[in-house]
Every structure is written in structure tokens, then in C-alpha cells.
Amino acid sequence: MPELSLFVWWLIGGVSSLFLLLAIYLYFFSYRPRAVENCEIVSNDERKTLPAGKTLKVMTWNQEFFGGRNHVYFFDLPMDKGKRITVEEAEMKRNRDHLIKVVKSESPDVLLLQEVDEGSSRTRYHDQEGELAKKLKDYPYRTSAYYVKSAFHPHRHILRPWRMKLVIFSKYSIDEAKRYQLAVKPALWIVRLFYLKRCVLEARIPLSKGGHLSVMNTHLDAYAQGSNTMAKQVKGVKRLLDERTEAKAPWVLGGDFNLLPNDMARKQLTKDQAELYNPHTELSY
């Protein structure tokens, strides 16, 4: 009996140690942003305000981590059924150079980017924001916000680092930048810990006659059918817009909403395509 008791205590100790290691892993490797956070601003020393009466040109682009549209990546399909996982170096360079060429040609005042990778295994650990900054010299002001940030992501197709963010490039100064957390898709608690933390990134650009223009960038959820996640996220974005409207503060919003403009649009899709969207567009909320 004493030997059995000793074995039981060893077993309890071993299981407790495993739970402790799991708790440490979850704490250090999961991303748990606060509801509102300040974001780092990169700029030169010159302060450049937006002139009164100027027409502002804004470009928004989901760059899809420079992966391009020639492949179906695992997260491009429901249940992660896509085949491709990693982007080839040549593809990334070609897609990055194409984005830079278009931006320089269109010359927007503000550039909103989604799905910008940094130190991710799928994009061979490139700093995509930094690479763009070196080429887009006309945009000395920028800020960014993560919506995936994991040194080791437990998804079966990843199992390595994954970091992805929203980025705003601007020709004009950014005085303040904030990240606003949106609703997270319902799931088991451990899945929610590592699930994408969708958000809104706001950059406040100073106006020459005083005050600021709020420029907001977002990327809402996809494949959230059967839940009210998208509706909650739309309401979260609308709340931010309403607050600025009530304060008589000018704003502009762009990004990838993963939504249809109206219910009629869904009827024009194939059956398989329509199943990716709820029967009624969340934009009606």
C-alpha cells in the first residue's frame, strides 16, 4: 500500500506539473489585447498637417500577406480546407512589388492595409511593413495593430510563429493611434485564446485649422455563419463612428469587411458561395 500511495502522489504531481506548463504556455504564447490600446507611431521629425479644403485620397488593400491569388491557402476555405500553407520568396517579392507600383501610381494620401505579416513562418519571417516602408518614401508616417500575435501558434497548419496586423501609411502626421478590440467568434476557451483578435486601428491626422481627422482601418471576421459575431463587430465599428459623428469629428473608414452590401447580392451567388454569408447582411444593423 505505501508503494501505491507513493505512485498516486507521483501521478498527481506529474499531472499538476503538466497543467502548470500548459497554463504558462497559454499565458506567454496567446494574445490577449485590452479593449483599447495605444499604438506605436513611426514618423520623421517634421509635423505635416492636412490642409483645409483638401480632397483626401484614401486607398484600402487586403494585401493577403503578399500571397497573391494564384493559390488557395488553407484559411481561404471554410474549415481550413485550402491546400497551400507557405508563400514562396519569388511570389512574395512579385506581389509586394506590384502593390508598391500601384500605390506609387495612384498616390493616395493615406494607405490602409490588411493582412500584413511580421515574423510569420508562412511568409518566411519577413517584416512586410518594414519592407514597404523602405520603398514608400512618400509615406513617412505609419502605425499598426496586431490581430494575430503568437510566438507559437497551435493551429495544425502552422505550429510556428504567426503575427499579422493592420497598417496605416500616411503622407501626413499621425498625432495619436489606438487599437479597439472587436467581438471574438464563439468557440472553446482554448480556441478563443489563439483565434484572430479582430480590431479597428485608428490614426488621428492633425488638421491645419485645428482638430483631427480620424482614419480607421479594419478587417472583420469571415466564416462566422451561425453566430452573431459579425453583427457584434459591425455594431462595434458603428459605435466608434457614432461617437466621432456626435463629437463633430471628421472620420473615414476603410478595410476588408467580409460582408455583402445587401441581401439582394447574396441571391446572385452560387449555393456554395451563398453559404459563406448569413441570410441577411450585417450591414443592416
What are these regions (language model features)?
Residues 82-89, 116-119, 183-192, 219-228:
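Surface-exposed cleft-lining segments at the edges of enzyme active sites
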Residues 133-138, 161-177, 203-208:
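Conserved beta strand-loop-helix elements of the APE1-like EEP
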Residues 172-210:
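Active-site catalytic loop in hydrolytic enzyme cores
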